[in-house]
Amino acid sequence: MDNLNLNKHTSGQFNAELEYIRTQVMSMGGLVEQQLTDAITAMHNQDADLARRVVEGDAKVNMMEIAIDEACVKIIAKRQPTASDLRLVMAIIKTISELERIGDVADKICRTALEKFSQQHQPLLVSLESLGQHTVQMLHDVLDAFARMDLNEAIRIYREDKKVDQEYEGIVRQLMTYMMEDSRTIPSVLTALFCARSIERIGDRCQNICEFIFYYVKGQDFRHIGGDDLEQLLTDHRRVDEA
């Protein structure tokens, strides 16, 4: 990943502190991405040992969030950052919260897989694995965009969530068909629906991280705009950057 071109300050220590928290976010992101990848694999392959490792690894994700958050608070208190520096710190605080929640999803998927699924549910898990891989790629891409604060890439990833939503809706229809055809599948299908919804939410969290990139680069809060208005804003910003 390319290094973000941070502002240069008269205090070399301030530069080092900003670079440290940015690097820590990328380390946390890498861990969460691996946790999610392993969770999807454990669910699909019914790998109990891998699932347990993911559950155990969630504590490290939580500790990293706390450590980065504390480092950000110290920077705000000590350096009183302004403008883009403050936006960077705020974007990091919000991003690590989203990453921690994605880590929680990985944990829940593994706990569910350990308790609820067996080999007889394999047909239900195939579509979940595909959706999971889609969100893993989305997470990987948004972490790369965050490392470079790449606005255009963030816009592309933001729009990618529509495909995740469509894939999720297809899975819901498929699972509902299973239930209607055989009522004995209802408990396992409901569990699969829970997993599918949890995985779909990862796309939403990646969208949130995209919004933090928009905020850092443009100094504008894009939350709660939504719909056609947001699409128009994103298109306008892209045209300005490409001009």
Swiss-Prot record:
Q: What's the protein name?
A: Phosphate-specific transport system accessory protein PhoU
Effect of disrupting the coding gene? Entirely abolishes the secretion of proteins from both type III and type VI secretion systems, T3SS and T6SS, respectively. Transcription of phoB is reduced by about 25% compared with wild-type. Transcription of esrC is completely abolished. Transcription of fur is increased.
- PANTHER family with a match to the protein in the record: PHOSPHATE-SPECIFIC TRANSPORT SYSTEM ACCESSORY PROTEIN PHOU
Phylogenetic placement of the source organism: Bacteria, Pseudomonadati, Pseudomonadota, Gammaproteobacteria, Enterobacterales
Top-level taxon: Bacteria
The answer to whether UniProt assigns keyword Electron transport to this entry is no
Report the leader peptide range.
none
Q: Which SUPFAM superfamilies match?
A: PhoU-like (SSF109755)
Known function: Part of the phosphate (Pho) regulon, which plays a key role in phosphate homeostasis. Encoded together with proteins of the phosphate-specific transport (Pst) system in the polycistronic pstSCAB-phoU operon. PhoU is essential for the repression of the Pho regulon at high phosphate conditions. In this role, it may bind, possibly as a chaperone, to PhoR, PhoB or a PhoR-PhoB complex to promote dephosphorylation of phospho-PhoB, or inhibit formation of the PhoR-PhoB transitory complex.
What induces the gene encoding this protein? Answer: Decreased expression in high concentrations of phosphate and iron. Transcriptionally regulated by PhoB.
| Similarity comment text for this entry | Belongs to the PhoU family.
Whichever gene encodes this chain, its name is: phoU
Q: Which UniProt keywords apply?
A: Cytoplasm, Phosphate transport, Transport
Quaternary structure, per UniProt, is: Homodimer. Interacts with phosphate regulon transcriptional regulatory protein PhoB and ferric uptake regulation protein Fur.
Q: Which GO terms describe its cellular component?
A: cytoplasm
Entry-linked InterPro entries: P_transport_PhoU, PhoU-like_sf, PhoU_dom
Localization of this protein: Cytoplasm
Matches recorded under Pfam families: PhoU (PF01895)
A Gene Ontology biological process term: negative regulation of phosphate transmembrane transport
GO molecular function: any one? protein homodimerization activity
